């Protein structure tokens, strides 16, 4: 709606077209207008630079690798491996941490299981120019404000409203949506709120 109000005539229903037009309008600051999960790359022909971005909570992955012959990126390491000509060295330290501490260790830093293949961090943009110079920028930091003047009932009401609005926003889709139930309180609560606030059929799956 924001783009249409600015006189931009969208040709498709694709998120990609919306994203591209936001970049044309706002440049690198386009991500400050987004709410959700993303991982994308845009090559800016005019300014001769590659722009990579990852969402605020790192829900979508983005790996990158720089060497003498180029800059490589992808949502999975295997894509980079298939393109890089030189042999990649195993990152033994990262492997040992994973074997010792499990999946929690994967997100403690930007290292991958291969040396020099890095993971773009949450809320981070990366610029690669034609000389392969890299520049990273943190575009968002949480700023929790504690209001100790509200009582427990007001806090519950406010939190419920925030959660309901967030779920409603995430359920915007051109196709049917579905929920994966784990059997726990979190997923069950989300489905319950979705069912109460949306006039859509709720499809659920349990594995």
What is the predicted role of each segment?
Residues 1-207:
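Cysteine-centered catalytic environments shared across enzyme families
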């Amino acid at each position: 709606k924001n783009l249409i109000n600015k006189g931009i005539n969208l040709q498709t229903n694709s998120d990609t077209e919306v994203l591209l037009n936001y970049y044309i309008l706002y440049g690198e600051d386009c991500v400050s207008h987004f709410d959700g999960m993303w991982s994308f790359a845009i090559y800016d022909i005019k300014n001769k630079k590659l722009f990579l971005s990852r969402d605020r909570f790192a829900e979508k992955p983005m790996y990158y690798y720089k060497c003498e012959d180029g800059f490589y990126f992808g949502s999975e390491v295997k894509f980079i491996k298939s393109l890089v000509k030189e042999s990649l060295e195993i990152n033994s330290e990262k492997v040992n941490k994973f074997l010792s501490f499990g999946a929690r260790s994967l997100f403690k830093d930007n290292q991958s299981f291969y040396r020099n293949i890095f993971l773009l961090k949450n809320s981070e943009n990366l610029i690669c120019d034609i000389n392969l110079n890299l520049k990273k920028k943190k575009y968002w930091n949480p700023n929790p404000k504690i209001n100790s003047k509200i009582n427990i009932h007001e806090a519950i009401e406010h939190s419920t409203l925030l959660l309901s609005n967030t779920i409603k926003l995430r359920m915007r889709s051109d196709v049917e949506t579905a929920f994966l139930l784990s059997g726990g309180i979190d997923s069950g609560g989300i489905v319950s709120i979705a069912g109460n606030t949306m006039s859509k059929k709720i499809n659920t799956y349990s594995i």
